[in-house]
């Protein structure tokens, strides 16, 4: 039956989770087409690989398709979805298509509210360094291969497992990681945090009897579900003394981290001296998760150490543009990051302060979704108030309708009441560049954050100026 599927169409193919799957399928020999209203680097790359890309949503786009793949961002009234259902063309959720890829490999699925993309990239890099030639599908562009995805010849596939719509329950990996559990996408779980935790347990229980769950013992909510898990478990952490894989002697070195990784699993014990080419304690935890996976798969220590030391990074994950000089000779350090949850913002700001101690931190943030802003409003106010200067643009709706008192102006008012900083509200994102140039002082660190259209701002900030030095680690 499967051989009848030759042409697969993706609705919203430019999305990070969609483009990676499409690329793997192209490399497997499938004919791929897709639609996306806004072209981006993903659609351009797919076109170069042979995909047919449409920049409209229209019924005729799926004319010869044997299956249509959709993400949860695609609404039921999309004309391509309507046409597919009318013609009885299978409409396949993105996670179900990802599950098909896992069925053909030994699947490693990285789950958690934060850190999925970086951890997935670290695991893929460790396997590649060990000569395992893994397939991977990542939510960001891995710089070493200039892609979200790659079809390898080895037995392993490494993927992100998305809890935002509970679609990770489609996946049946042999090894899984849970980095943390935090309040996000709570409408999926009817605003019941216990239901969210229970869904993670259900995800872990999809492992086969010989499978392994790698769980972060430092995260209180992950620790809370460990007694509910019947599968084999390896724990990791920094502060948890009972973790089987621990980091000690952690040192910041500009945009790198040094630490000792103590591995005590199955009665054996050894220590690795690690240099991680990423900043921040949160990335030390991500590296420990990757080490735990490598240890379970018997990856040589030398390969793990080298992969972490030479890790090339992921687009928009503490992506450094170096020192930028303005025409009036003021210079500042520019960093771009995808983080959009208060916990992610706090961790990234801490990493920036440790990497560039004593320098003023200017945060430029675009909130993502009205519902997230409403649900985490007080956390946003607290975290955003800790910047030295704040530029806040209007919310990127991601298709949501506005919610009263859950917009950027409301955040600005609440932050102003705190009295710590005077936030600057920028209504139109195309005004951000000039606003940054106005606010920035000599020696500042400018941190751009958000998951929406703000991703286009950092390249524009760097373009017309003179790069002094590019800091790579």
UniProtKB/Swiss-Prot annotation:
Alphabetized InterPro entries for the sequence: Mur-like_cat_sf, Mur_ligase_C, Mur_ligase_C_dom_sf, Mur_ligase_cen, Mur_ligase_N, MurCDEF_pg_biosynth, UDP-N-AcMur_Ala_ligase_MurC
A GO cellular component annotation in the UniProt record: cytoplasm
Gene Ontology MF terms: ATP binding; UDP-N-acetylmuramate-L-alanine ligase activity
Main location class: cytoplasm
Domain of life: Bacteria
The enzyme's E.C. designation: 6.3.2.8
Pathway where this protein functions: Cell wall biogenesis; peptidoglycan biosynthesis
SUPFAM superfamilies noted in UniProt: MurCD N-terminal domain, MurD-like peptide ligases, catalytic domain, MurD-like peptide ligases, peptide-binding domain
EC class (word): ligase
GO BP annotation list: cell division; cell wall organization; peptidoglycan biosynthetic process; regulation of cell shape
UniProtKB keywords: ATP-binding, Cell cycle, Cell division, Cell shape, Cell wall biogenesis/degradation, Cytoplasm, Ligase, Nucleotide-binding, Peptidoglycan synthesis
Transport recorded as keyword: no
Compartments, as annotated in UniProt: Cytoplasm
Catalytic activity: UDP-N-acetyl-alpha-D-muramate + L-alanine + ATP = UDP-N-acetyl-alpha-D-muramoyl-L-alanine + ADP + phosphate + H(+)
Positions bound to ATP: 112-118
Family listed: Belongs to the MurCDEF family.
Function recorded in the entry: Cell wall formation.
Protein name: UDP-N-acetylmuramate--L-alanine ligase
């Amino acid at each position: 039956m499967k051989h009848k599927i030759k042409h697969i169409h993706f609705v919203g193919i430019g999305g990070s989770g969609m483009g990676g799957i499409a690329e793997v399928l192209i490399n497997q020999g499938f004919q791929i087409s897709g639609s996306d209203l806004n072209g981006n680097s993903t659609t351009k790359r797919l076109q170069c690989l042979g995909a047919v890309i449409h920049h409209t949503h229209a019924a005729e786009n799926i004319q010869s398709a044997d299956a249509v793949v959709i993400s949860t961002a695609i609404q039921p009234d999309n004309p391509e979805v309507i046409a597919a259902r009318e013609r009885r063309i299978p409409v396949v959720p993105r996670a179900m298509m990802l599950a098909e890829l896992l069925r053909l490999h030994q699947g490693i699925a990285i789950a958690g509210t934060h850190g999925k993309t970086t951890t997935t990239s670290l695991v893929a890099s460790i396997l590649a360094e060990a000569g395992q030639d893994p397939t991977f599908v990542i939510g960001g562009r891995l710089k070493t291969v200039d892609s979200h995805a790659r079809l390898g010849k080895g037995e392993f596939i490494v993927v992100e497992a998305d809890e935002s719509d509970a679609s990770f329950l489609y996946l049946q990996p042999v090894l899984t990681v849970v980095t943390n559990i935090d309040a996000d996408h709570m409408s999926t779980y009817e605003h019941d945090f216990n239901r969210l935790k229970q869904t993670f347990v259900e995800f872990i229980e999809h492992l086969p009897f010989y499978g392994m769950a790698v769980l972060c013992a430092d995260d209180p909510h992950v620790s809370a579900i460990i007694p509910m898990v019947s599968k084999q478990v390896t724990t990791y952490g920094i502060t948890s003394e009972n973790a089987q894989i621990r980091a000690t002697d952690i040192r910041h070195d500009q945009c790198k981290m040094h630490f000792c990784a103590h591995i005590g699993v199955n009665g054996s014990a050894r220590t690795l001296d690690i240099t991680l080419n990423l900043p921040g304690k949160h990335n030390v935890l991500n590296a420990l998760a990757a080490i735990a996976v490598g240890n379970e798969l018997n990856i040589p220590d030398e390969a793990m150490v080298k992969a972490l030391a030479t890790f090339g990074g992921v687009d928009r994950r503490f992506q450094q543009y170096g020192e930028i000089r303005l025409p009036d000779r003021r210079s500042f350090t520019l960093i771009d990051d995808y983080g959009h949850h208060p916990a992610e913002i706090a961790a990234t700001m801490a990493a920036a302060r440790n990497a560039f101690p004593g320098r003023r931190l200017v945060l430029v943030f675009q909130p993502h979704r009205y519902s997230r802003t409403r649900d985490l409003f007080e956390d946003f106010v607290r975290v955003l108030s800790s910047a030295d200067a704040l530029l806040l643009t209007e919310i990127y709706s991601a298709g949501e309708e506005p919610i009263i008192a859950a917009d950027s102006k409301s955040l600005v008012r609440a932050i102003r009441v705190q009295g710590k900083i005077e936030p600057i509200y920028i209504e139109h994102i195309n005004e951000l560049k000039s606003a940054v140039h106005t606010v920035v002082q000599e020696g500042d660190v400018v941190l751009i954050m958000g998951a929406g259209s703000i991703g286009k701002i950092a390249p524009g900030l760097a373009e017309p100026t003179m790069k002094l030095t590019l800091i790579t680690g």
